[in-house]
Amino acid sequence: MSMEESIIRIPPYHYIHVLDQNSNVSRVEVGPKTYIRQDNERILFAPVRMLTVPPRHYCMVANPVARDAQGTVLFDVTGQVRLRHADLEIRLAQDPFPLFPGEVLEKDITPLQVVLPNTALHLKALLDFEDKNGQKVVAGDEWLFEGPGTYIPQKEVEVIEIIQATVIKQNQALRLRARKECLDRDGKERVTGEEWLVRSVGAYLPAVFEEVLDVVDAVILTEKTALHLRARQNFRDVRGVTRRTGEEWLVTVQDTEAHVPDVYEEVMGVVSVTTLGPHNYCVILDPVGPDGKNQLGQKLVFKGEQSFFLQPGEKLERGIQNVYVLSEQQGLLLRALQPLEEGEGKEKVSHQAGDHWLIRGPLEYVPPAKVEVVEERQAIPLDENEGIYVQDVKTGRVRAVIGSTYMLTQDEVLWEKELPPGVEELLNKGQDPLADRGEKETSKTPKLSTPRNKTRVVSYRVPHNAAVQVYDYREKKARVVFGPELVLLGPEEQFTVLSLSAGRPKRPHARRTLCLLLGPDFFTDVITIETADHARLQLQLAYNWHFELSDRKDPQETAKLFSVPDFVGDACKAIASRVRGAVASVTFDDFHKNSARIIRTAVFGFETQETKGPDTMALPQPRDRAVFPQNGLVVSSVDVQSVEPVDQRTRDALQRSVQLAIEIATNSQEAAAKHEAQRLEQEARGRLERQKILDQSEAEKARRELLELEALSTAVESTGTAKAEAESRAEAARIEGEGAVLQAKLKAEALAIETEAELERVKKVRELELLYARAQLELEVSKAQQLAEVEVKKFKQMTEALGPSTIRDMAVAGPEMQVKLLQSLGLKSTLITDGSTPINLFNTALGLLGLGAEAQPPAKKPTGGPSVQEGLLPISTAAPLTLGNNQVVP
């Protein structure tokens, strides 16, 4: 509907506001009505439904109209309704009503608040007013509107909050605090900040000045638990006992089954019952005396079957302990903390503070409060080969107890024997000195093993055919123990550690051991020698050795075994020195031919025999062993495992010489085999031709006999005139047969002569060819020897020109680099040859010993040609070719 219309129809229970523009006054027109608008009037809004407040509802109107005592609306002189500005009016259920100009619906129609049982509204007065009972209410007053009921709002009253009642269950209490001075539900006066408990079961609605802090649950107490409490301030508890600030006490099930801590009680915790069995005891520190106070510094011992609670301030020393039940092999070391007396009657014994004594089983023992158990001792079982070190604490003397079960006395303690770190490491390894002596240490870190019990007697099992030296520093003497035996060290005894050389070449202090093996055994060494013609060679020698003792019971004789700490290094150095001296006086060629003999004589030396030679002089004979008198070491044999040139050029020249000798021998054998095959072929062919001629002769002879028989038969058959003719014919046939036989015989003789001539010719041709081949081979051998001499002379002149120092520097630089290169490649043995050259490995040892062809059986000399050994050099004269580290091919 447009506001400019002149006729406005107002339905029932609707209203409009009309503004008189002349007087600027607004009024209300209520329907049902048809209102005709004047020209000076303006409709402010279309018809609006009146406000209808249903039952149990209310609304709030701001700036309400003023009414008189009869409820009539008041108007001012201008005709404008009079308003109560800045005021509020709460209107409850009534007939529909319009809003006058200036009135504002502050709060829409709202249901009245229903307050349920156990619920209250916390109200506060905003203005001073008088309630319906005529009592004056001052602004700021607070009170509760408790249910059940319906709360009628008032403009002077503000609803702060809704308060719910708190349900207090069994074994619960409600903790309250006063916000200001007031009276509680029981009528007791409470001051501001005071706290108290409400223990009554049920719903509790706090008063307006009561503040609910929390619900306190009761602590359920049993026979095994108690409640530890402490007073926050002076007060009287629920049982009427006066408590002081800081006082602590226990509440047990004998006092109450469920305890609700008061507001002045602080719960320190729940204490469990302490239960002792028949074999338990405990020591209580600072026990509570009859006056209820802790006796500081005192102790109390409880034993046996009982249960109790530790009072506040009491504590257990080391908790609940078991009664010491001692067997025959057990004991207790005790110490007196205070003077005390033990026993009864004549067995009464007094102890001063600090005394130590030992009690032995079997018994049950509970230490009194004045006695401290230092330790529980057990008898130490010892076998015949076991022992312990015991030290007397009074005298300080240490002794070893071996072979019997032993319990320490009160004045004895176990003594730890310290060993040098090297000895500890050797004992912890647990290696067999005989079986594991060849193992190399892959790492410097020792393997983790069980640490040695230092109180146990140190034992070491000496293997068979070995010896161990033990030195007593107290007696200042040594003893030697031969295996198999078990060595037990005394308190002042120590092992003699041997530091031996090992490796190839020998490195000093490479192996440490406690026992000395007596042999027989062997060790290997690598030495570098130089011949008279400055040829440097590397030898790998192996020596068999053992120790000789005339009397093992003689201390001086046995002490000689350990007089040389490193017998391996000492022997290797001595032998290497002898070998270098012997080889330095011979040339390379002589050493190559007689290397084994030279080395053996250098190592073992010579001795004079009774046998006299033709010149009436004693012939020196090589010894068969070398003896070191310092320690009785005997070297019984020496094995030359390898001989290898150090200089690369020497090695190459030797290799070429060996290859050339192999080629010459191969060519010679090939020519001899070819000649033998041709000779055998010619002989077979001659025998075949001769057999053919003999067969033809036999055939002709048979034919002649056949003809004779035919002639005889013809003569018998023919008679008469035919006899002469037959005889003539027979004679002619006979003559013809004889001629044929003679002709065949002559042919055979001619063929035989021709064959023999051919054989003679072929034989002479072959002999000439063989002589030619032999001369050619001899020329080649001579050429090779002359070339070798030229090479040797050239090498000698080059050596003299370069000088020993330059050659030594060159020789050291090259081989070391090549050896390192081969070692980095992981090669352990090397042989350089081609695929078509055979190598004889059967005569290696003979060629190594310098025997060569003398030790070989003589070869069968083939018929028709010279022997290979007559025209060629022996293979054994060639230089040895090293195969790996242990074999030499001559």
Swiss-Prot record:
InterPro entries: Band_7/SPFH_dom_sf, MVP, MVP_rep_dom, MVP_rep_sf, MVP_shoulder, Vault_2, Vault_2_sf, Vault_3
Modification note: Phosphorylated on Tyr residues after EGF stimulation.
Glycyl lysine isopeptide (Lys-Gly) (interchain with G-Cter in SUMO2) crosslink site(s): K444
UniProt region (Disordered), positions on chain: 425-455
Pfam families the UniProt entry points to: MVP_shoulder, Vault, Vault_2, Vault_3, Vault_4
Primary location recorded for the protein, binned into one broad class: cytoplasm
Protein name: Major vault protein
Organism: Bos taurus
